């Protein structure tokens, strides 16, 4: 019985079939098995135009494997190229070891110029590396502590952490912050570094049509005319009150103003802490300068990065794989890459969250 590999829509495989495959074959319940989230992720993304972009392996008996894939333009040194974000990869355990997973990956690398994925399992890592992917074990994650006592209570930490972690002391600022909607804007924002597209169409889909999460976007400006944008998501449960920075957009000259706004916003609104993921050195130097904790380097504390349910992992961040059909030094310079919590399905709701949302 022959096995076909291809894009789901080309092989006549529906989102319902794929989400059901995730439900049956993945080791735990994940949002990709929720049809509402699955459809938003893989059909409603602007470049997909209503067509499911996942890559599947199938024969006459049905699905054998799936790689979640979202088509997305990638800008390398200012030039748009054919890119994709990879997410959860799953093969029916009954055919594991037959090469179907590798065939799926080979199909994908033959159709794109660059690929990125996060949260790589140890089982999948050897296949990625053998296929020419680069691997970053830890994506930089920074944490700004507002309420030390509450953060220590939910974290793993050393006995001396309380001497090193202090409550936020935000300075006075003269910034103007305006809540905006991307659907009201006329121009794409400036984005530093090599990055996935942040066109208005992308941002409207990502932040204003999400089936479960609510995002707030602020435009931050000062008297000198510099302005930038921050996208925030509030994580408020019985166990935690954390502010997630999902995106920081604008030229480098706006970065510190945006971070200052976030620190003050978190303190004024009673959040316990703020966290942000970023690979871009132009941005990360400001987190270091402003003494944000590092999930990788601040070994005396491990602040949770999973919240439904609350869970501490070591380290409290995730990994990145990246691949280029024609790699060069510029592509391999991760310090020039801007990947944030916005990208590669990193800000995905858990099924626990979806269950609470639907109550």
What name fits each language-model region?
Residues 115-166, 231-256, 260-359:
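Active-site/acyl-donor-binding loops of N-acyltransferases
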Residues 42-56, 136-138, 207-218, 291-293:
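A short helix-loop-beta-strand connector motif used in the catalytic cores of GNAT acetyltransferases and
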Residues 54-56, 62-72, 85, 225-235, ...:
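Conserved beta-strand in the GNAT
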Residues 88-110, 253-265:
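Conserved acetyl-CoA-binding loop-helix of GNAT-fold acetyltransferases
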Residues 1-58, 85, 139, 154-201, ...:
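Short amphipathic alpha-helix that is part of the acyltransferase structural core
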Residues 52, 112-114, 213-215, 268-271:
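Short, high-confidence coil segments that cap the C-terminus of an alpha-helix
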Residues 182-238:
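Non-catalytic interaction/regulatory modules that flank or connect domains
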Residues 80-93, 240-251:
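Conserved acetyl-CoA binding element of GNAT-fold acetyltransferases
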